From Swiss-Prot:
Belongs to the TRAFAC class myosin-kinesin ATPase superfamily. Kinesin family. KIN-14 subfamily. It comes from Oryza sativa subsp. japonica (Rice). This is Kinesin-like protein KIN-14H. PROSITE patterns: KINESIN_MOTOR_1 (PS00411), KINESIN_MOTOR_2 (PS50067). The gene is KIN14H. Residues 1-63 are annotated as: Disordered. Residues 432-767 form the Kinesin motor domain. SUPFAM superfamilies: P-loop containing nucleoside triphosphate hydrolases. One of its GO terms (biological process) is spindle assembly.
Amino acid sequence: MASSLTPRSPYPKKENLGNARRGMGVKPGPRRNVLSAINNGGGTNSDTASVDGGEGGAGPAAPVIEFTGREDVERLLAEKMKGKSKTDYKGRTEQMSEYIKKLRACIRWYIELEDGYLVEQEKLRSTMDAENAQHAKLEAQLSSDLEELKAAHLNLTRQCDSLEESFNKEKADRMLAVESYEKERQQRESAEASLDLLSVDLERVSHEAKRFSEQLKMVQDTNKRLQEYNTSLQQYNSNLQADASKSGDIISKLQKEKSAMMETMASLKDLNNSMKNHLDSSRTSQQEAIRMKEQLMKEVDCLRIELHQIREDRDQSVSQVNTLSAELANYKELAGKSTKDCESLSVKVSAFEETCSMQQEQIQTLQKQLAVATNKLKLADVTAIEAMTGYEEQKVIIKDLEERLASAEFQIVEADKLRKKLHNTILELKGNIRVFCRVRPLLQDNDSSGAEEALISYPTSVESAGRGIDLMNQGQRFSFSYDKVFDHGASQEDVFVEMSQLVQSALDGYKVCIFAYGQTGSGKTYTMMGPPGRDQKGIIPRSLEQIFKTSQSLESQGWKYSMQASMLEIYNETIRDLLAPGRSNNFDLSTSKQYTIKHDPQGNTTVTDLTVADVFSSADVTSLLAKASQSRSVGRTQMNEQSSRSHFVFTLKISGSNENTGQQVQGVLNLIDLAGSERLAKSGSTGDRLKETQAINKSLSALSDVIFAIAKGDDHVPFRNSKLTYLLQPCLGGDSKTLMFVNISPEASSVGETICSLRFASRVNACEIGIPRRHTQARSFDSRLSYG
């Protein structure tokens, strides 16, 4: 700073005046407040800028030089030497020394000013450090309080969910108990309706039950053999195929026997109805007998009263006759009455005797009637006792028949479970993709003609029942067969029951993938999501309810599970995070993010920067599904009022560990709702809808190319042709259990798309992707979710 303020000198030696300051012995005075001494006008104070008389301090005292501001410094720098000639070196030297002293005083003033600034800066810095420390302490305390509040809020939320779940469970238990009581009452009433005719078929049913027991024993033996072979399935695959064919024959026989039993049950139902009518007539007869018994009892009571009255009248008449006879004798002996009086008395006696004889006859008649009524009463009592005894016997027989029927039905159910288990085992050994077909019901606003009603039919043969579907188009029949076919009357519960075992595999450590395919408006979203309501929920909410319920039941065996969920959509070949914080109402604030699909050597798939949420109950997933549904891209077309315009992918990562055995499992459940294929001529899409339709059809076409390449066994499978196929690569070409739902429309206007969907499903069903592998070894997972 001093060198910048020093004026240029005409002499070269004055260029380094700033450096000569140290050699002159000029020492700065003590620090002081800025300009305080100068403004106060102190003369000899050490805080005042002064100049010594000479170089050694021997000269006369110089006047005090004070600087009050920048103007004084500039004035000093602008000062010129005058009054001396060029040859007067001594005078010029004195002027130069005086000028140097002024410069030294100026420099000293600047140094003191700078020292004051430094002191004030140090004070401000210490004050700022103290304020920052206090602010950090306060911020840490606030963060701690906020974390405690969040933890308390989360705890209260979990307690509320737990209480609500307990309340719903108790309410459901009560409703179940009421339904059970009502069902038991109805069964008791129906049991009372079975009487005499069941005894005719009792022997035949017992023979059939015995035959069913023998067949069940044979099935159990077969099951035992299959369980023994299960330990060496990989080594003896060909042998198991032979056993599977034998099991198929047994299953066919069981299906036939099941049909026979269903016919027997129908005949038993008819028999029950006839027995119910017979019981009603018996009850009517019994009530009539009881009414007649009561009437006879009343008549007997009346007859007894009349008999008692007649006996009293007879006794009174006899006493009167005796009295008159005694009087007559007395009259004859004592009074000597006239003959006329005697005749009148005789007439009276005869009348009395006639009355007595008539009353005697009436008494005999009443006694006979009383005996007949008593016999009838005894006969009615005997009949009632016999009827009650027969009723109790029939009740015992009916109970025995019901137990046998329930046992036979249980055997049929167990045989069907065995069939499903064997079928799943065969499919796992083959490594095929399983395919289920579901037919959507005709909509109410569509006029269904006879041609539309006859468009789709279902084979009734034992081999194809429940697995085949026939389609008529222009007089030509197209037949297809899949692992399961659901007609238009199948409920959401029926659909989920068939695939519940596959969902269970995710908890066992397998990778599971379920996706819905079909044209737009064929019911894919209804099958996967379903509308709100207990009976209408789709595969995704039902699967999550089963997983959480099963994981809770396994806690008693030492298992603990942690689950993470994520949801995304592929819209116009762009991945969108449906759970992103800034996404709502189909508007994505995080479109700047570039989501990348990555596969690792273990077959796990991750999507970078994707939102992953920890879930602890089905209620947590329900709220996430509601948020994702609001964010998903939907639109209106001519074929569908609410058409999904993107592929929806829900993924649940499951990590489980057993404290007792130390075993760890890691499973993944992928549930996918594909966008529907559509033809531009029918959908009438334009603008953005046209771009969406083209992107959807392109990705589905890429999926078809992948399926065809796998079916033909090509060395190269074009998984990278679309985001959808690249995301599904572990499911279509890895070691996962994969199930495809093909949804079709029964309308005649959609028959072309329906045939294409069914043909594509047949090719998918023929694809062999490898045997599923269970992941039981502990591995470090990325913090983001795996789609493997």
